[in-house]
Structure formats: structure tokens, C-alpha cells
Amino acid sequence: MKVNDRVTVKTDGGPRRPGVVLAVEEFNEGTMYLVSLEDYPLGIWFFNESGHPDGIFVEKME
């Protein structure tokens, strides 16, 4: 995924939420995405852990 991609994010206790990627940071363990959400327009960071399906919080919108 890259900046400006439309995505959904997994959050605790609710359905996936739509957002837009504002920034991407790569790490050995996975990727951090700064995602703008309706109630966090300036963005909130989510981490996708490499190699662990349960650690995937950001997915590209179809």
C-alpha cells in the first residue's frame, strides 16, 4: 500500500473503519501506516506485522 490509498482498519470492538493512508514507514517486523479516519482526520498509526495474519490491521479497500 502507498500514500493516498483507500483502506479499512481493524479496531477493537467494532467493524472495520474506512480511511486514507497519509504515510508509510517500513520496519524489519512489518509496516506502520498513518491512516486518516473520520474521527482522527490528522491520522493515527497502525502496525501491520509481517508473517502474522492476526497482526494485520490495515487492508487496501477493494
Swiss-Prot record:
**A Pfam family:** DSRB
Tell me which InterPro entries the record gives.
Answer: Dextransucrase_DSRB
Disulfide-bonded cysteine pairs: these are: none
Spell out the NCBIfam families in the cross-references: PRK10708.1
| HAMAP family (UniProt xref) | DsrB
The entry sums up its family as follows: Belongs to the DsrB family.
Q: Identify this protein by name.
A: Protein DsrB
**Organism, per UniProt?**
Escherichia fergusonii (strain ATCC 35469 / DSM 13698 / CCUG 18766 / IAM 14443 / JCM 21226 / LMG 7866 / NBRC 102419 / NCTC 12128 / CDC 0568-73)
Taxonomic path:
Bacteria, Pseudomonadati, Pseudomonadota, Gammaproteobacteria, Enterobacterales
Q: Which gene encodes it?
A: dsrB
